[in-house]
Amino acid sequence: MVDFETAPINAPLAESDPAIARLIDQERDRQETHLELIASENFASSAVMAAQGSVLTNKYAEGLPNKRYYGGCEHVDAIEDLAIERAKELFGAAWANVQPHSGAQANFAVFLALLQPGDTIMGLDLSHGGHLTHGSPVNVSGKWFNVVQYGVDKETQRLDMEAIRQLALEHKPKLIVCGFSAYPRTIDFAAFRAIADEVGAYLLADMAHIAGLVAAGVHPSPVPHCDVVTTTTHKTLRGPRGGLILCRDAEFAKKFDKAVFPGSQGGPLEHVIAAKAVAFGEALRPAFKAYSQQVVANAQALADRLMARGIDVVSGGTDNHVVLLDLRSIGMTGKVADLLVSDVHITANKNTVPFDPESPFVTSGLRLGTAALTTRGFDADAFAEVAEVIADRLLNPEDDAIQARCLERVASLCRRFPLYAMATEPALV
């Protein structure tokens, strides 16, 4: 056997590439010792990471299961079929495509399947909690299509379905997008369906943020009401980073399959698809429902305690995992708040709030999410303590003693709720 010294295929990562191994180790330490409150992040299980870090990364498999352009696909066919069946069972869908590399790719495939350049679409304004792919002018969705953006009511900071209906009647969109990246309230998918039917529009639900809550029955499902549903597979679903498309109509299914491949992607990432299958299997277990219920209870506890400390929360609370702070109530910008909590090892992100006078690079809001820390085992009491730390830091930005105490409390919480305790990163095995 030839020994290729330049290709140490059996060497562990720490030996083969110590620089990358060291950086991965540092990132793991950061995740263990910081409080993760970014609403779009979560912690995948060791099983999910093991599947994603497997030999499946070696296999090329253009096409759909049992309709490949390459040989040797019998095992990845079985894996992808299992991922599809689990996704359908989890969300009550008639069809699923598990190949999109991301939620943005899933949305793009839907646009490619249903629309032509110049068609009119409606989506939630980014500054009101929407997403870049819902018609933002900096995204391809805002460049290819005529975009009509709807927003929330200025007083209630909630979706005004009658105002949305009037916009739809005026502009007659070909497709309406319902979904968000920073909207803390329940979405009435049935009301969106009625509007879409009235104007003859397709209805796309982007449930990327709430997919796990939908799977667990904690948030109403869009699947019975929408022509097509897209999602990411991480966030509240707690899987690998990736995308998913669901629908209930065989005619649409063929269009979406072709829009994914060959329309917008080449070979699927079968190692990621295997990890998706594992995550879907985990979400089908009874424990996942209890987890998702706790995610919402924790968000409500976080919001309540922050409001009690005098910090406004957009819409006055939350129905899901998102808590969006309106920092105008304490005379602070999101940019400053982001840096302040980061100094005490709390990870969040600045975010626009409805009718925000600040630029997207500054903002008046701070977006928080409870999915990741709930995975660590945080309960409502622990989140009330997290809220106290955040409030202490934001309300006393110049007090070094309070900053030091906040750091101590964060460290204590991290020790009480360890993440991958005593586990070995798959990449380092």
Curated annotation (Swiss-Prot):
CDD domains on file: SHMT
Chief place where the protein resides: cytoplasm
Subcellular location: Cytoplasm
Keyword Cell inner membrane: no
Keyword tags: Amino-acid biosynthesis, Cytoplasm, One-carbon metabolism, Pyridoxal phosphate, Transferase
Annotated EC: 2.1.2.1
Catalysed reaction, written as an equation: (6R)-5,10-methylene-5,6,7,8-tetrahydrofolate + glycine + H2O = (6S)-5,6,7,8-tetrahydrofolate + L-serine
Pathway involvement of the protein, from the record: One-carbon metabolism; tetrahydrofolate interconversion; Amino-acid biosynthesis; glycine biosynthesis; glycine from L-serine: step 1/1
Entry GO terms, CC: cytosol
PTM sites of type N6-(pyridoxal phosphate)lysine: K235
Pfam families: SHMT
EC class name: transferase
GO terms, molecular function: glycine hydroxymethyltransferase activity; pyridoxal phosphate binding
Cofactor section: pyridoxal 5'-phosphate
Superkingdom: Bacteria
GO BP terms in the entry: glycine biosynthetic process from serine; tetrahydrofolate interconversion
Residues annotated to bind (6S)-5,6,7,8-tetrahydrofolate: L126, G130, H131, L132, S359, P360, F361
Plays an important role in substrate specificity, annotated site positions: H234
HAMAP family noted in UniProt: SHMT
The family this protein is said to belong to: Belongs to the SHMT family.
Quaternary structure (record): Homodimer.
Function statement: Catalyzes the reversible interconversion of serine and glycine with tetrahydrofolate (THF) serving as the one-carbon carrier. This reaction serves as the major source of one-carbon groups required for the biosynthesis of purines, thymidylate, methionine, and other important biomolecules. Also exhibits THF-independent aldolase activity toward beta-hydroxyamino acids, producing glycine and aldehydes, via a retro-aldol mechanism.
UniProt-recorded name of the protein: Serine hydroxymethyltransferase
Lineage: Bacteria, Bacillati, Cyanobacteriota, Cyanophyceae, Synechococcales
